[in-house]
Curated annotation (Swiss-Prot):
GO terms for biological process: L-histidine biosynthetic process. It comes from Azotobacter vinelandii (strain DJ / ATCC BAA-1303). The keyword Nucleus does not apply. This is ATP phosphoribosyltransferase. It is an enzyme of class 2 (transferase). Heteromultimer composed of HisG and HisZ subunits.
Length: 211
């Protein structure tokens, strides 16, 4: 059995056409089904529907053989028990700092609100800056508006939500896209099969994004 972990939303919508190129098509529509384990047209391939932030955990610990996760999630997760063999070049966005338009630099320690705590710690440590990091799970844009934080670190797509709340994108931390990840043990045990899938997906990606 080959198990692939995916999260609902943009990544799922963009991944399914790529999997179809490899002959893997879910029997039920994952967006409409309440099931979290979705069978596919191949009897020995199934999809697991999990939270985006949990995809690396399922893959690293062997509950899934493969998965698709955003680079932002992988940067925050930082696990060592998985391979990242392929950039699928889907769900593209940017991980950036943002703050109030025209705001002056704070006199004391910078306060940064984000759900990407590990990324934030590494980013500011590399700059030699001491900051107070505030963990939030959503509505990041609110933090600078109510004085909770001076800046935020978040994923930025169009930037419209930032601008609508009087914020502006500032420093680029990373360019983000979704990656195929593979459990290390699975890669050894099912090498030929997984490598064939990787090669097929790579060809599908390259046909969409010719050099």
């Amino acid at each position: 059995m080959l198990t692939i972990a995916l999260s609902k939303g943009r990544i799922l919508d963009d991944t399914l056409p790529l999997l179809a190129k490899a002959g893997i098509v879910p029997i039920e529509n994952p967006d409409k089904s309440r099931k979290l384990i979705i069978p596919t047209c191949q009897e020995d391939v199934r999809l697991l529907i999990v939270r985006a932030t949990d995809v690396p955990t399922y893959v690293e610990n062997g509950a899934a053989d493969l998965g698709v996760a955003g680079k932002d999630v992988l940067m925050e997760y930082g696990g060592q028990g998985l391979y990242e063999p392929l950039d699928l070049k889907i769900a593209n966005c940017k991980l950036m700092t943002a703050g109030k338009v025209g705001a002056e630099a704070p006199r004391g320690r910078l306060r940064v609100a984000t759900k990407f705590v590990n990324v934030a710690k590494r980013y500011y440590a590399e700059q030699g800056r001491q900051v107070d990091i505030i963990k939030l799970y959503g509505s990041m844009e609110l933090a600078p508006l109510v004085g909770l934080a001076d800046k935020i670190i978040d994923v930025v797509d169009t930037g419209n939500t930032l601008r609508a709340n009087g914020l502006e994108p500032q420093e680029l931390i990373a360019t983000i896209s979704s990656r195929l990840i593979v459990n290390k043990a699975s890669m050894k045990m099912q090498h030929a099969r997984i490598q064939t899938l990787i090669d097929t997906l790579r060809a599908a990606v390259e046909s969409r994004h010719p050099a």
